Amino acid sequence: MDHLKKYITEINDYPKKGIVFKDLNPIYKEPKAWKELMFPLQNLISTKKPDYIAGIESRGFISASALAFKLEIGLITIRKPNKLPGEVIGTNYKLEYGEDRLEIQQNIIEKDSKILLFDDLLATGGTAGAAGKLIKKAGGNLIGYAFLVELTELKGRENLDSNLLVETLIKY
């Protein structure tokens, strides 16, 4: 999958000084490149038989919704604060460049439903780790994590449940 790196733009000092942001938008506008990423994920995820894919705001929504549609399973959105109606469950966490909070609707997850967590990029693992804890807090059974890109030098896998699947397709 390394040949697909040519579609990933690097933007220095975004969103904060010292960060090199990996912009995946060019992949989404190239159907063949996006398809090449999505098919292996679709095949892998289908073997795990999740009830839902949970996508993390906002870039995780793009591929998570496409995968959920293709696999004919539900999509759960994990959002930043104050973006969801009704009662929510939330958790605070640390980012590579600060702190943030994630929330889901209180009754959106059926108890013990199998959920695969998806985001576009694994960096420090802070966001995905927090989202995984949130899924469990809401009563879901987290069965694994999938990402398009992993920044290996940041060792994000160390902040995820090591007993679960962690799949990434492009590594830096």
From Swiss-Prot:
Keywords: Cytoplasm, Glycosyltransferase, Purine salvage, Transferase
Catalytic activity annotation: AMP + diphosphate = 5-phospho-alpha-D-ribose 1-diphosphate + adenine
Membrane-traversing stretches: none
Chain's gene name: apt
Role of this protein: Catalyzes a salvage reaction resulting in the formation of AMP, that is energically less costly than de novo synthesis.
Protein name according to UniProt: Adenine phosphoribosyltransferase
UniProt xrefs under HAMAP family: Aden_phosphoribosyltr
GO biological process, one term: purine ribonucleoside salvage
InterPro entries: Ade_phspho_trans, PRibTrfase_dom, PRTase-like, UPRTase/APRTase
Family: Belongs to the purine/pyrimidine phosphoribosyltransferase family.
Localization (cell): Cytoplasm
EC number: 2.4.2.7
PANTHER family attached to this UniProt entry: ADENINE PHOSPHORIBOSYLTRANSFERASE
Pathway, per record: Purine metabolism; AMP biosynthesis via salvage pathway; AMP from adenine: step 1/1
Pfam families per record: Pribosyltran (PF00156)
Keyword Cytoplasm carried by entry: yes
Top-level enzyme category: transferase
Subunit structure: Homodimer.
Superkingdom, natural source: Bacteria
Organism, as annotated: Prochlorococcus marinus (strain NATL1A)
GO molecular function: adenine binding; adenine phosphoribosyltransferase activity; AMP binding
GO cellular component: cytoplasm
